[in-house]
A protein has these predicted regions:
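Nucleotidyltransferase catalytic core that binds NTPs
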Residues: 1-163
Length: 163
């Protein structure tokens, strides 16, 4: 019987990628026993202003940070998928790459406003929502619309909060 591969998805503008991203990725690999994490860099974040770094600079910085880390891979899918929306990227990974066991990783700051994301209910049906601590957001995140909707289905990782 074929082993079911467990994939973590950490998406965003990565403006820029930093050691905090690497730290939570390593924690997720260990705690969730993930086979791989994809850092899915998007050209633009619909909730943020224009990025400080160019897309090519952000990809380069991310690749430098994960150098010598075998289980983390940097990818850019906006052009292939035709969108930077998380739901479109997840659907692409499921349909085209045949991925099934996906852990969608966000910070507790994003959990607070996750109900504003496009097709968020579909996104949480297709993945295992995994939430990392962010300073000042954990309590708000646990009381959020999405947390109430999912009840006990969110995986909370109690890491040392990243600022």
């Amino acid at each position: 019987m074929k082993k079911k591969i467990k994939i973590g998805i950490l998406g965003g503008s990565f403006d820029p990628a930093h050691k905090g991203h690497l730290k939570i990725s390593k924690i997720a690999i260990k705690k969730l026993k993930l086979d791989k994490i994809l850092w899915v860099i998007t050209n633009k974040n619909p909730f943020k202003k224009k990025p400080f770094y160019s897309l090519s600079e952000r990809i380069l910085i991310a690749k430098k940070i994960i150098k010598n880390t075998k289980k983390i891979q940097v990818t850019y899918l906006d052009k292939i998928v035709g969108s930077s929306r998380s739901i479109k990227i997840i659907e692409h990974l499921i349909i085209k790459k045949k991925l099934k066991n996906i852990y969608f990783m966000i910070g507790s700051d994003n959990l607070v406003t996750f109900h504003k994301w496009k097709s968020w209910k579909k996104l949480v049906k297709l993945t295992k929502l995994t939430v990392f601590s962010r300073s000042g957001y954990d309590k708000k995140g646990k009381k959020s619309i999405v947390a109430k909707y999912l009840k006990n289905k969110i995986i909370f990782i109690n890491n040392k909060p990243i600022l």
